[in-house]
Amino acid sequence: MRNFTFKGLLLAAMFMVLGSLAIQAADDDGLITKQITVKLEKAGTLPDRIGSTKRDKITNLKIIGEINGTDWRVIREMAGRDYYNDGTDGKLAILDLSEAKIVSGGESYCYEFHQEFYTHDNELGTHAFLNCYGLTSLTLPAGLTSIGSFAFAGCYVLTSLSLPSGLTSIGDGAFYGCSGLTSFSLPSGLTSIGDQAFYGCSGLTSLSLPFGLTSIGSQAFRDCSGLTSLSLLSGLTSIGDGAFYGCSGLTSIYVYAEKMPKLGTNMFDGCDAKKCTVYVPKGTYDDYWLSEFSYFENIVEFEATGINNVITSNDAKELSRYSVNGQRLSAPTQGLNIVKYSDGSVKKVAVQ
């Protein structure tokens, strides 16, 4: 009798613990708040792993393995959009795809404008997360090379985004209207930014354009009114019409291209022509004054050669930092900084 009672108490205690854990993992609406990890042995099997009754309960998901169009249908459904881009009851807010790989195959994941969209190897497809209003945080696959058109358009509460180092292109309208984004790093291998890619990302306060970037599309950063400083590096060959239209918060633009890129029209309309100062390479004032940059009243030459945006030395340590006027700086300061290192080197660093 005593053994039976002891076993009964033990079982009761175990059920109480399990019940407590279940309560901690779900909120009052039955939503699962802890991260759910799904490892796929084969692409196209996510519908089998996450049944239809559970898809609108998961808020935090990590997927490991290969995913194709069939899987992407489920991801979109969980993130609030079905195949026809109509709303669902999905509540997915946090998605980690760092150990996933997007592959070709499976069903089409979206039908829009009389067109079906399919996955392709290492590409985040067109309309992948279009109007997924609840998505707040996303880590993309490490092997991703491109982001398709309007992939995140309308994801206005997206605040955290990790872009992989191998990303080379961002498509048209990719982040259109993502006003919740405040800052993120564009990878060094990125070469092109499409038309209207960041249109209306008014929450962006800082943005570092990589050295490898060669083209910025038309209206790419239109109405990014939160941006205060911008650096256009020497590798740029073309900037489209209205690329920075309506960026009313800009106070400084640093241009490092001694050979002027091909410039579109109305690039800076809506910016503050008096408040914003443009810094151009020494000896190029006339060229820039005769170009679209003449929109601004203040164009100043500076020594732009030998600029280093990223310091990669593992051994050298920073000893001191100065402004271009020779003033000692206690911390990295927006604009051009001159930095002395312990190995004796001196480098010019663009700080945005």
Where on the chain are the PLM-derived regions?
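C-terminal tail/sorting-segment detector
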Residues: F6, L336-Q352
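Bacterial N-terminal signal peptides that target proteins for export
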Residues: M1-L11
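Structural signature of tandem-repeat unit edges
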Residues: L31-E41, T59-I67, G87-N122, Y133-S146, ...
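Bacterial N-terminal signal peptides
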Residues: L9-S20
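Short, surface-exposed loop/turn motifs with a glycine/proline- and acidic-biased composition
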Residues: S323-D343
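Residue-level detector of functionally pivotal "anchor" positions at catalytic/ligand-binding pockets or at interdomain
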Residues: E301-N325
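Terminal processing/anchoring signals of secreted or surface-associated proteins
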Residues: L61, Y288, G306-V310, G326, ...
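Consensus positions within tandem repeat domains that build extended binding/scaffold surfaces
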Residues: G125-A128, G148-A153, G171-Y176, G194-Y199, ...
